[in-house]
């Protein structure tokens, strides 16, 4: 039984970044292809890669669930589900953070602070395990996520 469920997608800022990156790639490919038509197939690799990455971001979503077994975090199509058993949770608390400064960006990140799963925003729940691992879960409903984890742990202990 799930006591918390949240789905998040990347915001408009991702699309702006992808457009900023893709326009020069496409323009460069067209410019080079105009000078050497035989190289067209090789040159199209750049725009195709950009299109595939854009498509992945379009369908990718961060899904967070809390149930009687634990916390489950997944980036559909981009990363396998991360399962954190309730018995491994030492502490979970809602907090503000900077995805770029604290974890080096958005998506699935590993930094000296631990793992992060986020699509944007500056709020999340930091889950600290009994083994010392730290997992930041970005959430637009951080207080609800924190409460759901606490409730699931309490229900398991009862």
Residue ranges and their predicted role:
Residues 46, 50, 68-69, 106, ...:
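Generic signal for short, ordered secondary-structure residues
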Residues 49-91:
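Conserved beta-hairpin
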Residues 19-26, 46-54:
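Hydrophobic alpha-helical transmembrane segments of multipass integral membrane proteins
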Residues 1, 63, 124:
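A residue-level signal for beta-strand positions that form part of recognition/binding surfaces
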Residues 36-48:
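Hydrophobic alpha-helical transmembrane segments
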Residues 1-37, 116-117, 131-134, 140-147, ...:
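N-terminal membrane-targeting/pre-transmembrane regions
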Residues 74-140:
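Non-transmembrane, membrane-adjacent beta-strand/coil modules in membrane-associated proteins
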């Amino acid at each position: 039984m799930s006591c918390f469920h949240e789905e998040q997608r990347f915001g408009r800022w991702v699309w702006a970044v992808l457009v900023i990156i893709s326009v020069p790639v496409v323009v460069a490919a067209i410019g080079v292809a105009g000078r050497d038509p035989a190289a067209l197939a090789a040159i199209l690799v750049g725009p195709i890669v950009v299109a595939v990455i854009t498509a992945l971001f379009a369908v990718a979503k961060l899904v967070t669930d809390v149930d009687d077994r634990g916390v489950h975090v997944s980036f559909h199509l981009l990363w396998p589900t991360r399962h954190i058993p309730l018995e491994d949770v030492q502490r979970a608390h809602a907090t503000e953070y900077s995805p770029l400064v604290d974890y080096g960006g958005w998506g699935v990140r590993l930094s000296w602070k631990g793992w992060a799963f986020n699509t944007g925003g500056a709020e999340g729940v930091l889950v600290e395990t009994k083994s010392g691992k730290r997992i930041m879960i970005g959430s637009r409903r951080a207080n609800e996520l924190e409460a759901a984890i606490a409730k699931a742990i309490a229900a398991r202990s009862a």
